[in-house]
């Protein structure tokens, strides 16, 4: 069966499915991050739905990936930038086309604002980001 991937902003009734997908991120990277709280994740997803960006990828009507971002303010300036909050695609669906499409949606949402895209899982894909004109601004360092 041919896989057809569709990309769209979720409807309000799709948010529960988005929360469930994001818990799969926690399952995959649980050794790197603290335990996820269902209420906190649901609250964050709803906040992004109303005030930011959520864009999902669906393969044959099944949610396979999502990107979420929200406007934020620099600590030193009133100017806003776009802060990526999550960017997750299920492992068996990870490919350039899906990642590219979700990142292009993020860039379009940003318009002329700077986008900050931290990679904190250790699975950095520099070529993907370079192809889409992102610039490497350093590294995330972690203690504990």
Q: Model regions: which residues?
A:
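Short amphipathic alpha-helix that is part of the acyltransferase structural core
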Residues: 1-36
């Amino acid at each position: 069966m041919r896989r057809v991937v569709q990309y769209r902003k979720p409807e309000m009734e799709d948010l529960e499915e988005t929360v469930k997908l994001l818990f799969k991120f926690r399952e995959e990277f649980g050794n790197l991050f603290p335990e996820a709280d269902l209420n906190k994740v649901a609250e964050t997803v709803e906040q992004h739905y109303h005030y930011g960006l959520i864009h999902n990828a669906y393969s044959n009507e099944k949610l396979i990936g999502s990107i979420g971002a929200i406007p934020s303010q620099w600590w030193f300036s009133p100017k806003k930038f776009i802060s990526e909050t999550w960017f997750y695609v299920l492992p068996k669906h990870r490919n350039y086309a899906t990642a590219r499409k979700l990142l292009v949606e993020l860039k379009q949402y940003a318009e002329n604002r700077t986008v900050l895209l931290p990679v904190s899982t250790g699975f950095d894909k520099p070529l993907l980001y370079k192809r889409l004109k992102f610039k490497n601004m350093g590294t995330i360092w972690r203690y504990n």
